[in-house]
Amino acid sequence: MKPTTIASLQKCKQEKKRFATITAYDYSFAKLFADEGLNVMLVGDSLGMTVQGHDSTLPVTVADIAYHTAAVRRGAPNCLLLADLPFMAYATPEQAFENAATVMRAGANMVKIEGGEWLVETVQMLTERAVPVCGHLGLTPQSVNIFGGYKVQGRGDEAADRLLSDALALEAAGAQLLVLECVPVELAKRITEALAIPVIGIGAGNVTDGQILVMHDAFGITGGHIPKFAKNFLAETGDIRAAVRQYMAEVESGVYPGEEHSFH
C-alpha cells in the first residue's frame, strides 16, 4: 500500500474531499484501522486519560508518547502518523526539537503542539530542521488549568479574531496541518477557508477538511462524561471493523459531525 502523506491531505483539501483520522495507541488497533483504510492516526497525549487512567493529559511524558508511537508504527507502517508533544515538552524551541527528534525516531511523521502565536519561533525552528508540525488551537487540553475546565473556545468576536490570527501565524511559520478543538462551527469555517493547509476538527462541526476522534469515544468505551461531539459508532454497527468503516463514511459524506455534535 502506498504511504499516506501530508501531500495526500493537501490534495483532499484542494479537491474538497473530507477525510477521517483517529487516535491510536497500540499495534493491534493501528493494524485494524490501517486494514480498513483509516490511514491518518494520532498518538495523542489523550492516552494519559484513556490508557493510563489520569484525570488530565498533564502527566504524560515524551517517553510515553515515543513508546506508543513505536507500537502504532509497527501496526500501520504506511499511515501518516502524528504524535503529540506532551505538556512542558516544548517550552523552548530547543527543547521542542530535542523531544520531537525522539518521537520522530520512534516512527512519527509529524509532531502536534498546542498553542498560538507564542509558538511561531518553535514552529519555524522545527520546520527548518525537517520536523513537520501540526498546530492545535481552540480547546487545548494541556491548558485545562488556565481555561478552568474543558470549555468551548473562540466565542465572541475578540476571541474568534484571536484564534484566526493564531491560525494564520502558525501557517506562516510553517505548520502543515491544524487541529481545531471545541470551537463554534462559524469560526471553524472561517479558519478552514482562510488557511491553505488542511484543518482537522474535533467538536468544530462538519466544515473542516477532516475530523478526528479519540478512539475510545468512537467506540463508546470512554468512562464518565461523554463529550457532546462524540458519537458511538460501535453501538450502531455492533462490529468494530464496521464501526471504523461507518465513521469514515459519515465523515466523508458530511453526515458526521451533525448539528447535535456541534457548537455555536
UniProtKB/Swiss-Prot annotation:
It catalyses: 3-methyl-2-oxobutanoate + (6R)-5,10-methylene-5,6,7,8-tetrahydrofolate + H2O = 2-dehydropantoate + (6S)-5,6,7,8-tetrahydrofolate. InterPro entries: Pantoate_hydroxy_MeTrfase, Pyrv/PenolPyrv_kinase-like_dom, Pyrv_kinase-like_dom_sf. Pathway: Cofactor biosynthesis; (R)-pantothenate biosynthesis; (R)-pantoate from 3-methyl-2-oxobutanoate: step 1/2. Keywords: Cytoplasm, Magnesium, Metal-binding, Pantothenate biosynthesis, Transferase. 3-methyl-2-oxobutanoate binds at residues 45-46, 84, 112. It comes from Escherichia coli O17:K52:H18 (strain UMN026 / ExPEC). Its cofactor is Mg(2+). It is found in: Cytoplasm. NCBIfam families: panB, PRK00311.1. Belongs to the PanB family. GO terms for molecular function: 3-methyl-2-oxobutanoate hydroxymethyltransferase activity; magnesium ion binding. Catalyzes the reversible reaction in which hydroxymethyl group from 5,10-methylenetetrahydrofolate is transferred onto alpha-ketoisovalerate to form ketopantoate. Its main location: cytoplasm. Mg(2+) binds at residues 45, 84, 114. The gene is panB. GO terms for cellular component: cytoplasm. PANTHER family: 3-METHYL-2-OXOBUTANOATE HYDROXYMETHYLTRANSFERASE (PTHR20881:SF0). It holds the Pfam family Pantoate_transf. The active site is at residue 181. This is 3-methyl-2-oxobutanoate hydroxymethyltransferase. It is an enzyme of class 2 (transferase). SUPFAM superfamilies: Phosphoenolpyruvate/pyruvate domain. One of its GO terms (biological process) is pantothenate biosynthetic process. Its EC number is 2.1.2.11. Binds 1 Mg(2+) ion per subunit.
